[in-house]
Amino acid sequence: MDVMVLEGDGIGPEIMSSSLKIMDVLRENYDLKINPIRYDIGAKTADEGKWTLEKILEAADPYKAILKAPMGDPKLVGESGTEKALDIILGLRFHFDLYANVRPVRLLPGIASVLRGIDDKNSIDYTIVRENSEGLYSSHFGGMVLRDSVAIDNQIVTREGTERIVDMAFNLAEKSKGALSSGKRSVTCVDKSNVLKSFAFFRKVFDEVAEKHPHVERQYMYGDAMTQYMLLHPRNLNVIVTENMFGDILSDLGASTVGGLGFAYSANLSMKKGMFEPVHGSAVDIAGKGIANPIAMILSMGMMIDWLGFSKDRLVLEEAMFSAIRKDTKTPDMGGGAKTAAFTEQIISELLNNS
């Protein structure tokens, strides 16, 4: 099976290279039947005119799965002042209707949390399901500035969009082991229904969909309150479902509790297509230094492997990574001194020893 690989910008090509080296080992020594097709696509190549959004979408169309490295460069902005990379990222999401952004918040073995009382024995493991096709971010291609005096962006919440994202959240909860503190399966609706009609509608549809999932508990929390709850009681959480921008913000906060964005991985899903990517950016300030943490990229690849039906290979991959971390082969952001290449080679060594 062919998958599309987008190499991105900044540290993107470096951490993608690490991931694909590991994929090669899985292909040669395990059961993985995936063939990566690499494309030098990112904000830089788009800015240089090598790739237009239309050409990128056309190239991506035949693939069921896309593995995407971080894209973007703060220096590359369009006339509106927004980064050019967003045209590619949001273009892919909207064009292929990748409506569900699934972002696990998971503390890996051997990684320290900034939260008191959280460790390997009292860990963190929940999932944020972010509506990915509407909400406030749907204004990216349609916001306006009037007479250089007023800027307007609109939030869009539809019944169809809300029903399908909430249904996915409940389905994930049903398949999960529940909250770490209690084992209870639950979905928490995060909104500002006390202020905005769009969020009140989101909650109304949430309740309607919840009726179809009687074995999963429903919970509610306002977006501002959830920022505190995620820090104080993360082990009580199972699945969170929320609007586009709230999901973006909350998942970054969640990442800070499990080691940082270097450990934040994600999937953008529709019924027929998936795009898998780290949550973090392209970190152009450390590009080329060989010190980037590739874990989020590798775990995103693991999500893709699992989604394509190779769940055993994902488990093998993750166990090899955990072994590498336990042996203190850590990049600087993890408190170690290893280079990206050394960490990658340690994972490969673990895979080969267990094959």
PLM feature segments, named:
Residues N194-V205, V209-L253, T257-G262, L351, ...:
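Accessory "access/gating" subregions that flank catalytic or transport cores
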Residues D31-E54, M230:
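N-terminal beta-loop-helix "entrance" segment that forms/cooperates
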Residues D31-N35, K177-V190, H213-M221, F310-E318, ...:
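Flexible, glycine/charged-enriched surface loops at secondary-structure junctions
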Residues D9-G12, K64, V129, A169, ...:
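Buried hydrophobic positions in well-ordered alpha/beta secondary-structure cores of metabolic enzymes
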Residues M4-K21, V25-R27, R147-Y222:
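Glycine-rich phosphate/diphosphate-binding loop of Rossmann-like nucleotide-binding domains
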Residues S19, M23, M297-I305, I347:
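Buried hydrophobic packing segments
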